[in-house]
Amino acid sequence: MGKDSLATVILALMHHEPLDEIVYCEVMFDKEISGEVPEHRTFIYETAIPWLRRAGLNVKILRANTTYKECFTKTIQRGKGKGKLKGFPLCGRCNIQRDCKVRPIQKYMKSLPQDTQQYVGLATDEQDRLMRLQEKQISLLEQYACSESEAWELCHRYGLLSPVYDFTDRNGCWFCPNATLPELRHLYDHHPDLWREMLALQALPNKATEKFNRELRFSDYDILFHNEDAQLCWFTQ
């Protein structure tokens, strides 16, 4: 539930577009820990959802039957990686996005009337993604010529801008392989418990993938940030 999705809701209300309910799918790290950056999860449940409900909207919360950790530790059954743990998802081919977010939404959509239309939070300056919209998917941001920066302003005006946008211009799971360096640094500095969870997964043997993303292992980022802090400490002495 990022700025583009919330800006879509605001536009729908402003322009009296039909809107039956808000569907939010929460990706989970394990059965207890959310995949949302903690500050963002607090924003969703304590600010965004109450605001939506006060506006008279029904909010449907979905979760997949599987989690990031279960996908990570699942044993590959065939192919050259047979017998290994799946390990870190591949950038550009993220099985977590597919299994933990897309599938629950698709399953829920099948329970709705066939003519149900889905609003998707894609701004006018995301043309590559807009080109991939499927039948019965609509971007109100495109329809009302709203860019990503304008979506940011709209959410800010209505008190619906998540605090994660203080340190990143995107919204993703805290274990996402597309996470930027500032996002990872924020996790390292402010959520050491979650950081340790990822280091524990990195330490598991017999993984099909060892790198967290295209460039580095998660443990490499741990060394990087540790060295940065040590250097800063040396300069301040």
Model-derived regions, located:
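Nucleotide-activated chemistry modules centered on ATP-dependent adenylation/adenylyltransferase
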Residues: M1-Q237
